[in-house]
């Protein structure tokens, strides 16, 4: 199976990117997970010629060719980051790569709630008629993410690893 791991932030030191890298490594024997950055997308503005920027088209193609998408979102002020909203606007402008595409939402945050409010908002956005992704019912919340990884980038929380395993197998069933 092939998945796209969409890094939903432009932060250089993101624990959401770390989480996606861990998922990529942890499930390497079960799936090919390619991490995709959105930080270089231009600010969305409906282009007069209706042409998408080349870097957006590349991501659209990767999503279309994937069996599913895993989106890692941080939470800023109870919301998804502007860069993620910007990317979703681009990949739903006249193209529909996420239409009925299975999407799993993950989120890491420094605090206790693990990006739960951003994940709720992201779920609503992904259900919009212009996107209409098949958002999976489960989501993975990683709280206290600054302390969640060891020096090798592995999760140190056994419960978090077990939860991720359960979600993975639930998704496969």
Predicted regions and their residues:
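N-terminal beta1-alpha1-beta2 submodule of the flavodoxin-like/Rossmannoid cofactor-binding fold
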Residues: 1-94, 151-169
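Short helix/strand-capping connector loops at secondary-structure junctions
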Residues: 140-154
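Short, proline-centered helix/strand-breaking motifs
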Residues: 73-74, 102, 173
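Short, glycine-/small-residue-rich phosphate/pyrophosphate-handling segment
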Residues: 101-144
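Rossmann-like dinucleotide/phosphate-binding beta-alpha-beta segment
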Residues: 128-132, 168-173
